Design a protein with these regions (language model features):
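N-terminal signal peptide c-region/cleavage motif recognized by signal peptidases
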Residues: 12-15
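Phosphate/pyrophosphate-binding betaalpha-module
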Residues: 179-188, 211-232
């Protein structure tokens, strides 16, 4: 398995960046994934992609409209046509009420129904989702949700597979197998599990009193098991008082160390969206939140979705540029922060190469055994 070769992986990352000289601005920009308005690339978006060296974009139906399959393909082609490192293109194509692309795309049943399907049917569904998204130029699906069903809350409910960790693991593994067969990256979310809380992080900071020992047996079990089958994990904006009572998971060095060391995970760590109210209530600015997330160990900062909740507006593109400038200036003055930027930049490049997003001719010819 790939994760057994961590020391060689780190050497590879160092060699990877030695082949091509990248500016600090490019390195910082690769950690940004943004959303935007409209079904075409505007001049403003093109300028931001160019100046900030954006690492990825995410599509939303409430921002980009009801895109047909041909429109998705054209938009993705436009985004990838600009100079610089090719970008991640992502979507939340979970199924049920969270299926961002519907026009011409197969209808995906909500996750709570999946336990009624056979393993082969789950794999086939994963392959179909993967095929349709890849044809549209999409490389990442923020799915499956592997939070356990919380029977006392309607927060995620139909978006979750089951209240049984074993059932979640088996079904999610089949879906991820289907994704991977089609070359689509699946992202398991929302680590360590919203099933342990009742509050909505879009609006406030969820806090759980659940003991860490119980989390290990229940909510964390799917993440620990499935981490060996995925390239990426998304962290949640929630506090587990028994593990790190001070910081939300996305901003917790202790939680990120658990992912890297205890779970032996060397893939990408995505934050949940930093425009959520839980983040904006805890941090004085998005600049501060972004710095804290990177210092904690995040590889990709997600600036996607509604801000504030219910407004159907995403973060203005000039704000993205301002945040990028702040992070770049900090990296120039802080060697420790610069090292974190370079680690996450290298990890992004490695996985873009591994999954065929980044042209291999631009990288060193080092092969990597999985």
């Amino acid at each position: 398995m790939f994760f057994k070769f961590l020391p060689f992986f780190l050497l590879y990352l160092n060699g990877l960046c030695a082949q091509v000289e990248y500016s600090l601005e490019e390195k910082v920009g690769q950690l940004f994934m943004i959303s935007f308005h409209g079904n075409e690339v505007t001049e403003e978006l093109e300028e931001i992609i160019d100046r900030v060296h954006i690492g990825g974009v995410i599509y939303f139906n409430f921002l980009n409209g009801e895109l047909s399959r041909s429109q998705v393909e054209r938009l993705s082609h436009q985004i990838q046509s600009f100079r610089g490192i090719p970008r991640w293109i992502a979507v939340d194509q979970e199924g049920g009420r969270v299926q961002r692309l519907t026009k011409g795309f197969s209808k995906i049943p909500e996750a709570s129904f999946w336990k009624c399907m056979s393993p082969n049917a789950i794999v086939a569904m994963g392959e179909l989702i993967g095929k349709e998204l890849k044809e549209g130029g999409i490389s990442i699906n923020f799915s499956p949700v592997v939070d356990l069903t919380n029977l006392n809350s309607n927060l995620l409910h139909s978006r979750t597979i089951s209240s049984s960790a074993d059932e979640v693991i088996a079904i999610a593994k089949s879906l991820l197998f289907g994704f991977r067969h089609e070359g689509l990256i699946g992202v398991i979310k929302h680590f360590p599990g919203h099933g342990a809380v009742n509050e909505d992080s879009h609006k406030e900071v969820p806090v759980t009193e659940k003991k860490f020992s119980l989390l290990l047996k229940e909510d964390l079990a799917p993440f620990i098991c499935l981490s060996q089958h995925v390239d990426a994990i998304m962290t949640a904006h929630m506090i587990v008082k028994d593990f790190d009572p001070k910081f939300m998971v996305s901003f917790s060095q202790k939680w990120n160390a658990f992912i890297r060391n205890d779970m032996n995970f060397s893939g990408l760590i995505f934050t949940d969206s930093l425009v959520m109210d839980a983040v904006q209530k805890e941090y004085e600015s998005l600049e501060t939140a972004a710095i804290c997330a990177i210092e904690a160990g995040a590889d990709v900062l997600l600036f996607g979705g509604e801000s504030p909740v219910g407004s159907k507006k995403t973060l203005p593109l000039p704000r993205i540029e301002a945040i990028h400038k702040t992070l770049t200036e900090k990296a120039k003055k802080d060697p420790v922060f610069l090292k974190r930027i370079e680690e996450s930049f290298s990890r992004n490049l490695y996985f873009k190469n591994k999954r065929g997003i980044f042209p291999s001719a631009q990288l060193c010819q080092t092969s990597f055994a999985e």
